[in-house]
């Protein structure tokens, strides 16, 4: 079985993660004690349940999850929450001090003291796997623990399991809604790490999620619960092909191969259709064309970047439910033909589709969208501008240097982020003809040698 080991860190990561497990338990028919409920279920629920669960004694299913935080609060609320009993008690790893929204505390001081106990749990879980496919990490980049300790863990896992996939669900700071003043610092230092150590980053941000809740779901006062509901639907969609039988499968590695034309450009926008609010999973029966249309809609993207401002390098569409693959293919071709200016022409057929037969609970069919668009640079550019504004005056730096960080590290992170923006811009502007001329020149030089 191709197992995925799930890690959640910090307050944001733990809240998203616990929501995700509620969704996955629901899909696989696992109740709050970890037992499988057979009524109304089907064999397919158990067929590949090993991807996310370990089977323990007495027929209980235990999530392959590691939960970490530098303060006990969020963990305790998960533990006392509805699904708190299904996790392995040893897999809760937490400190008492908190990171105080300080990346340096998470990455170098407090987090570094706790990281070995987290890695022990990760190793134990990895040893329980038959054929570990990779890791998925939920965290935010604005705080201290998820960003600082999250990226520390990612780099440690990278060292120990270099050939396994590393997928992150990273919540970026929002443009208008700021939780803490030092978000731009924490986010830039984190991106510096993610560019090097992660294989695939799904970029999320609260503001875009709020917009979806307001505009599409018509919720007047969305809670984090509603936002996390959207994220968990997407997370479940990304891995459904591994967990349920399908006609066209995809896994984390296939996704990466199809989506990442250049190694550093692995930050994706995600979307989901049909969008339903948490309480009213209306029994909407959409058609494949409607799903496709909604999923490519800019309003559907879960990060604050507008795909119409850039071009898609690659994209992936994952459909769930009983549908004709021919229709799926036709729709995908249709999207590419109608919006050809939004796709780079030097990667032909750059949309991959996959179909999984089992839809999510209460839906006839659904689709998950993952796009590698150059417009994601808007997010990085925005954070980078805020970073530069503060860093120029060395504002708040003493909190970081006090934990032993060097200003040099800030400068490096800043230029790495700016390089990333420049790379996206370069490929956004690239056109097919120029590439050809370049290749011919290359060949001529080669002949001369």
From Swiss-Prot:
It comes from Cicer arietinum. It comes from the Eukaryota. InterPro entries: Beta-tubulin_BS, Beta_tubulin, Tub_FtsZ_C, Tubulin, Tubulin/FtsZ-like_C, Tubulin/FtsZ_2-layer-sand-dom, Tubulin/FtsZ_GTPase_sf, Tubulin_C. This is Tubulin beta chain. Dimer of alpha and beta chains. A typical microtubule is a hollow water-filled tube with an outer diameter of 25 nm and an inner diameter of 15 nM. Alpha-beta heterodimers associate head-to-tail to form protofilaments running lengthwise along the microtubule wall with the beta-tubulin subunit facing the microtubule plus end conferring a structural polarity. Microtubules usually have 13 protofilaments but different protofilament numbers can be found in some organisms and specialized cells. Keywords: Cytoplasm, Cytoskeleton, GTP-binding, Magnesium, Metal-binding, Microtubule, Nucleotide-binding. Belongs to the tubulin family. Mg(2+) binds at residue 71. It is found in: Cytoplasm, Cytoskeleton. The keyword Metal-binding applies. Its main location: cytoplasm. One of its GO terms (molecular function) is GTPase activity. Pfam families: Tubulin, Tubulin_C. GTP binds at residues 11, 71, 140, 144-146, 206, 228. The keyword GTP-binding applies. The lineage of its organism: Eukaryota, Viridiplantae, Streptophyta, Embryophyta, Tracheophyta. One of its GO terms (cellular component) is microtubule. SMART domains: Tubulin, Tubulin_C. GO terms for biological process: microtubule-based process. Tubulin is the major constituent of microtubules, a cylinder consisting of laterally associated linear protofilaments composed of alpha- and beta-tubulin heterodimers. Microtubules grow by the addition of GTP-tubulin dimers to the microtubule end, where a stabilizing cap forms. Below the cap, tubulin dimers are in GDP-bound state, owing to GTPase activity of alpha-tubulin.
């Amino acid at each position: 079985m191709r197992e995925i080991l799930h890690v959640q860190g910090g307050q944001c990561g733990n809240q998203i993660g616990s929501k995700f497990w509620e969704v996955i338990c629901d899909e696989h028919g696992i109740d709050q004690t970890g037992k499988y409920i057979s009524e109304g279920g089907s064999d397919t629920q158990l067929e590949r349940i090993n991807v996310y669960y370990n089977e323990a004694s007495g027929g209980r299913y235990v999530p392959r999850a590691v939960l970490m935080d530098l303060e006990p609060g969020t963990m305790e609320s998960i533990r006392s929450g509805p699904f708190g009993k299904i996790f392995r008690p040893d897999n809760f790893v937490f400190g008492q001090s908190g990171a105080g929204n300080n990346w340096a505390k998470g990455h170098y001081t407090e987090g570094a003291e706790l990281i070995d106990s987290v890695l022990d749990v990760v190793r134990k879980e990895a040893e329980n796997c038959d054929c570990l496919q990779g890791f998925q990490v939920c965290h935010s980049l604005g705080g201290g623990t998820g960003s600082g300790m999250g990226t520390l863990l990612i780099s440690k896992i990278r060292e120990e399991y270099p050939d396994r996939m590393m997928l992150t669900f990273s919540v970026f700071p929002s443009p208008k809604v700021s939780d803490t003043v030092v978000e731009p610092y924490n986010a830039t230092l984190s991106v510096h790490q993610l560019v090097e150590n992660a294989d695939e980053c799904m970029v999320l941000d609260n503001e875009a999620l709020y917009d979806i809740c307001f505009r599409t779901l018509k919720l007047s006062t969305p809670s984090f619960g509603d936002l996390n509901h959207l994220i968990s639907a997407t997370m479940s969609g990304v891995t459904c092909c591994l967990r349920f039988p399908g006609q066209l499968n995809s896994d984390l590695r296939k996704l990466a191969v199809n989506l990442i034309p250049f190694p550093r450009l692995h930050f994706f926008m995600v979307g989901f259709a049909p969008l339903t609010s948490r309480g009213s999973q209306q029994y909407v029966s959409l058609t494949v064309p409607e799903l496709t249309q909604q999923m490519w809609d800019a309003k559907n993207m879960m990060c604050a970047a507008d795909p119409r401002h850039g071009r898609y390098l690659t994209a992936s569409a994952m459909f769930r439910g009983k549908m004709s693959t021919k229709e799926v293919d036709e729709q995908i071709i249709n999207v590419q033909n109608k919006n050809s200016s939004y796709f780079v022409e030097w990667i032909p057929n750059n949309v991959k589709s996959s179909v999984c037969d089992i839809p999510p609970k209460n839906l006839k069919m659904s689709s998950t969208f993952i796009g590698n668009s150059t417009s994601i640079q808007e997010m990085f550019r925005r954070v980078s501008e805020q970073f530069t504004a503060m860093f120029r005056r060395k504002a708040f730096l003493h909190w970081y240097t006090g934990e032993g960080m060097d200003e040099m590290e800030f400068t490096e992170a800043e230029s790495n982020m700016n390089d990333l923006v420049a790379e996206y811009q370069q490929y956004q502007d690239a056109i097919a003809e120029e590439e050809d001329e370049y290749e011919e020149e290359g060949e001529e030089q080669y002949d001369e040698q």
